[in-house]
Amino acid sequence: MLILTRRVGETLMIGDLVTVTVLGVKGNQVRIGIDAPKDVAVHREEIYQRIQRGDEPVASGAHHNDDCSD
């Protein structure tokens, strides 16, 4: 596992097309933004596991808005 340190506002690249930006840190929560092509699915791990088990249908566009709550 690659471990990186980033500050709020800093970004890292995954390949040429995916960027991950640290948007904020509050207590033990880190808020990140992910910019990826529409054909790249992005999910929180627990959502991904539910999808793999067939517990949750994949909604169109859900890969860009898994958890937008504060």
UniProtKB/Swiss-Prot annotation:
UniProt main location, coarse: cytoplasm
Gene3D superfamilies: Translational regulator CsrA (2.60.40.4380)
GO cellular component: cytosol
Segments traversing the membrane: none
Biological process according to GO: mRNA catabolic process; negative regulation of translational initiation; positive regulation of translational initiation; regulation of carbohydrate metabolic process
UniProt xrefs under Pfam families: CsrA
Localisation: Cytoplasm
Example of a GO MF term: mRNA 5'-UTR binding
Keyword entries, A-Z: Activator, Cytoplasm, Repressor, RNA-binding, Translation regulation
Similarity section: Belongs to the CsrA/RsmA family.
Subunit description: Homodimer; the beta-strands of each monomer intercalate to form a hydrophobic core, while the alpha-helices form wings that extend away from the core.
Function summary: A key translational regulator that binds mRNA to regulate translation initiation and/or mRNA stability. Mediates global changes in gene expression, shifting from rapid growth to stress survival by linking envelope stress, the stringent response and the catabolite repression systems. Usually binds in the 5'-UTR; binding at or near the Shine-Dalgarno sequence prevents ribosome-binding, repressing translation, binding elsewhere in the 5'-UTR can activate translation and/or stabilize the mRNA. Its function is antagonized by small RNA(s).
Annotated NCBIfam families: csrA, PRK01712.1
Protein name from the UniProt record: Translational regulator CsrA
Source lineage: Bacteria, Pseudomonadati, Pseudomonadota, Gammaproteobacteria, Lysobacterales
Gene: csrA
